[in-house]
Amino acid sequence: MLNIVLIEPEIPNNTGNIGRLCVGTESRLHLIHPFGFQITDKNVKRSGLDYWVHLDWKEYQSVEEWMTQIPDLSRVFLMSSHAQKSYYENQFQDGDWIVFGKESVGLSQEILQKFPNHLKIPISPLVRSYNLANACAFVIGEAKRQLIK
């Protein structure tokens, strides 16, 4: 099972879509406060549709609280547009943690410094960033492809 981590998500529709993606790929979703919405927000539920009741998810009050749940810090991969290595080059394993930052600014330097593994999604210089839910779909899809082999 993959562990998908959203640190301080801001947009309920993205979180709902990612929740549905996690149900479909049998991944666990980890949400780290603060959020830009309430989990009960109708937009989260609408985007996740009726799948939200099947979602395997956990929430944490802080990054530090979440970090206590990680058995092997070397299997944590932070998604960052500033990373040198593409997620295509990574060898994913069952149980890996794939971490995404907030929609507006990504991951803070403080968080990036806590983990050595940073990955990027290749992107045209004409585009600043991908939508968070789309970025999750890219990376989860590649990780699942590798795990099925």
Where are these regions (language model features)?
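Structured adenosyl-cofactor binding patch, chiefly the S-adenosyl-L-methionine
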Residues: K114-K149
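Short internal beta-strands
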Residues: R28-P34
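S-adenosyl-L-methionine/SAH cofactor-binding core of RNA-modifying enzymes
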Residues: D41-L107
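Extreme N-terminal starter segment of soluble prokaryotic enzymes
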Residues: M1-I4
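Cofactor-binding loop segments of dinucleotide-utilizing enzymes, especially the Rossmann-like FAD-
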Residues: P9, P34, S81
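Amphipathic alpha-helical repeat scaffolds
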Residues: E10-N17, N131-A133
